[in-house]
């Protein structure tokens, strides 16, 4: 015997919300880690290459146009850090050494 279908299956809307966090250290907390601070001040491209390598990307990525911006945005996305592409752009454009030091410290803390 067959039974008629009286209701359609419903689609379950599962929504996952991830809790966004802040950077563990501030943009101007450069002196919290003196070796990183000195490297970011006097050899920022070397620090950028190290950050890229530690993050699992090609060490040449910082030399590509927009490479540092995508690296910082990728770091925010991977670690669920609050912010926006605009904030990333402003930090890297107006305060490159501080932004690089912040990224290096974040990787040290997270890894």
UniProtKB/Swiss-Prot annotation:
Main subcellular location: cytoplasm
Keywords in alphabetical order: Cytoplasm, Keratinization
Annotated compartments: Cytoplasm
Keyword rRNA-binding: no
One Gene Ontology cellular component annotation held by this UniProt entry: cytoplasm
Keyword Cytoplasm belongs to the record: yes
Pfam families: PLAC8
Disulfide bonds: none
One of the GO biological process terms: keratinization
InterPro entries for this protein: PLAC_motif_containing (IPR006461)
Described purpose of this protein according to its UniProt entry: Part of the insoluble cornified cell envelope (CE) of stratified squamous epithelia.
Listed NCBIfam families: A_thal_Cys_rich
Subunit structure and binding partners: Directly or indirectly cross-linked to CE proteins loricin and involucrin (IVL).
The family this protein is said to belong to: Belongs to the cornifelin family.
Name of protein: Cornifelin
Organism: Mus musculus (Mouse)
